[in-house]
Amino acid sequence: MIYIFTMVFSLNVLILSSSAARYDYFQFTQQYQQAFCNSNPTPCKDPPDKLFTVHGLWPSTKVGRDPEYCKTKRYRKIQRLEPQLEIIWPNVSDRKANRGFWRKQWYKHGSCASPALPNQKHYFETVIRMFLAEKQNVSRILSMATIEPEGKNRTLLEIQNAIRAGTNNMIPKLKCQKVNGMTELVEVTLCHDSNLTQFINCPRPLPQASPYFCPIDDIQY
């Protein structure tokens, strides 16, 4: 009887440990609404703002595939947080579909964020705190360096230095996309350690062959 109990207990531990995700760091990714809509194959249903807003907070690995769709409890509506999420984390392509966007982000990424973010409430509250209270808002960081969304051509170094000035001199990850002959800054990722306690240099820079690789100059923002 003791032998059977031990086997069952060991099996349960094995199942639980196998469902836990392994990750090395977090990517806090924000997208510039106008550039996103310009590059999106499907037209955005709402006029975009000249702002960076949250795309997601993603547990990530330095080598191999990032964890996705981990075992989790059923998603629940987060009505108390929705007024803030609607501002900082909208579904840019269709704001009437915000809830579906948040749900997808939770199931795909947030479900794998334990132990740093052990549940859905903690996950969304942390994003709000990072963006608002901790001022990890890319629009604000660029503005502090007098880089405003004026549709001007910027150099890669100019953008990188501005962001590094607001993130303890850590290197961000940038995504650009060429639309109608112009290269636009589409996304900025700020990277954090696995406990979300400090900025780190973003691992895994985009290869030069990537369609999102940013050139050294003539980046419109």
From Swiss-Prot:
The stretch of residues making up the signal peptide is 1-20
- Subcellular location, in the record's words? Secreted, Extracellular space
GO annotations of cellular component type: extracellular region
What does the entry give for GO biological process? RNA catabolic process
The answer to whether the entry has keyword Mitochondrion is: no
Domain of life of the organism encoding this protein: Eukaryota
**Which PROSITE patterns does this entry report, sorted A to Z?**
RNASE_T2_1 (PS00530)
Query: What is the reaction catalyzed?
Result: a ribonucleotidyl-ribonucleotide-RNA + H2O = a 3'-end 3'-phospho-ribonucleotide-RNA + a 5'-end dephospho-ribonucleoside-RNA + H(+)
Report TM segments. Answer: none
Belongs to which family?
Answer: Belongs to the RNase T2 family.
Do you know which CDD domains this protein is assigned to? Answer: RNase_T2_euk
- Post-translational modification remark: N-linked core structure at Asn-91, Asn-137, and Asn-153 contains xylose and at Asn-195 contains xylose and fucose.
State its role: Self-incompatibility (SI) is the inherited ability of a flowering plant to prevent self-fertilization by discriminating between self and non-self pollen during pollination. In many species, self-incompatibility is controlled by the single, multiallelic locus S.
- According to the record, glycans are attached at N91, N137, N153, N195
EC number(s) per entry: 4.6.1.19
Q: What is this protein called?
A: Ribonuclease S-2
Active-site feature positions: H55, Q105, H109
Mainly resides where? secreted
Q: Where does RNA bind?
A: Q31, H55, N91, V92, F101, K104, Q105, K108, H109
| InterPro entries per record | Ribonuclease_T2_eukaryotic, RNase_T2-like, RNase_T2-like_sf, RNase_T2_His_AS_1
What pairs make up the disulfide bonds?
Answer: C37-C44, C70-C112, C176-C214, C191-C202
Keywords from UniProt, A to Z, are:
Disulfide bond, Endonuclease, Glycoprotein, Hydrolase, Lyase, Nuclease, Secreted, Signal
The Gene Ontology terms for molecular function here are: ribonuclease T2 activity; RNA binding
